[in-house]
């Protein structure tokens, strides 16, 4: 039996020798590689924090002491040493262990995360609650240098420093978020990592300046006058010191002894402390060390070779989006592309290679990305800002206030719309229809397949005013991509087939599910109208009302929440017209959706052929057909 099998709770770590800890670290890395190679997951971030996690749990007393993992995708080691070893093979599977901290899983998961830059705010909250309750415990936020580029992190640092809150921030600096970090903070941290001048004292520099013949004394005096600048040159972490934090580091994040020593030191400080830890993303697995971006969030792979297992499949919507945008940008130099630290995930890496001057990765800063795009538009460009649906939630005010209210020509590409699979509820994109369709001047569309996505992107760039375009994470339908692009009439749905008995309205790829269900209904004698809605805003009220009056029965199908979704919009149209004799069945989600394969999630919520047939039965469509035939 190895050492890992004997670790049931963090207290079991405290009696281990350093050679035993080194062996344990190897076992943990092997276990994570084994499980993630089968299930997929965030491998590289976790390989980089093994020693760091062990040190935290040896020095601090979880769950009494609160350890908060920013984003949370680097919490696998934490899960393995906090009593979830036996369930670890179910990581990210349907009904299995979450890939992120979840309060319902363990008392050691004190705060749920999934989006970045929230941990310091949470730590301040826990610390203030502790102080108000007169309790004695430590609060630790672990945040990566990528997440530190998020504005929310600095809001929390500012609050903690101003209030002198007794808490610890561990800056896990691996020089990467998902892709290579960008921005001034990244440059600043890089100087802390690499600049040997931090090891010199102010006196040594002044003495060196004085030795320069003729001008040395004057230079030393100039340096004295510029003491603030010199201080920034000489004192590591001064940015954090100026914000009210005691800065400790940088520390080798793979040196177990050094980590434990610095954490013990941090515990002695009764004011906010920032511990700067240097780690290697992907450490201990050669393929991941060579390509940490690929193994940041990876699907199943061959653990011997590191080769990702890919089945033959059509291109993804994301790939088609990125390629089409490049195609359009070749002809229009005004087209620019913006992303928030996700160039590869949003399909914009090809655009970045072809048009580097027109590509902007603003870091983990969705609010800035959207407002920046609005000003680009008013400056004469055609910005396309691509962000995951779940992260657009962070920029809602900017969408409303900076893009839509002044009618900016911004195309908002909403990637990962609908359920996304194994990453679970923090990453599902199932709220965007609800919060975007209420904006009066926003043209909001969703393609049924990858070819329609091309035409919608082309249409978006021809329109005057803000446009939102939502599409899923999955592969396309495998349809032919037409070369010639055309504009799609705004606010007009596509009637794919007509039938007198029931109307099926789908949005996005759910349209194909409606078509498949219509075939099954036909086998039962039910003739269905199938509508590809295309535009969520403005709605094709004319088509909705026409077929509602004809069939009296409607089923709406959407990969989205029911409340405020497309089905709700259809019912609003019917209500406005007073069509009380039309009955509607809405298929979608009515709760936070768990993790699992997309197909399993769709089936579980009735977004399937079987689900549509059951909805038709609830509408008594079959009984109506049987009644007509017996007359």
Curated annotation (Swiss-Prot):
Keyword line: Isoprene biosynthesis, Magnesium, Metal-binding, Thiamine biosynthesis, Thiamine pyrophosphate, Transferase
Keyword Transferase attached: yes
InterPro entries: Dxylulose-5-P_synthase (IPR005477), THDP-binding (IPR029061), Transketo_C/PFOR_II (IPR009014), Transketolase-like_Pyr-bd (IPR005475), Transketolase_BS (IPR020826), Transketolase_C (IPR033248), Transketolase_CS (IPR049557)
Record flagged with keyword Transcription regulation: no
GO CC, any one term: cytosol
Cofactor notes: Binds 1 Mg(2+) ion per subunit.
Subunit structure: Homodimer.
Function, in words: Catalyzes the acyloin condensation reaction between C atoms 2 and 3 of pyruvate and glyceraldehyde 3-phosphate to yield 1-deoxy-D-xylulose-5-phosphate (DXP).
PANTHER family: 1-D-DEOXYXYLULOSE 5-PHOSPHATE SYNTHASE-RELATED, 1-DEOXY-D-XYLULOSE-5-PHOSPHATE SYNTHASE, CHLOROPLASTIC
UniProt protein name: 1-deoxy-D-xylulose-5-phosphate synthase
Annotated organism of origin: Desulfitobacterium hafniense (strain Y51)
Lineage of producing organism: Bacteria, Bacillati, Bacillota, Clostridia, Eubacteriales
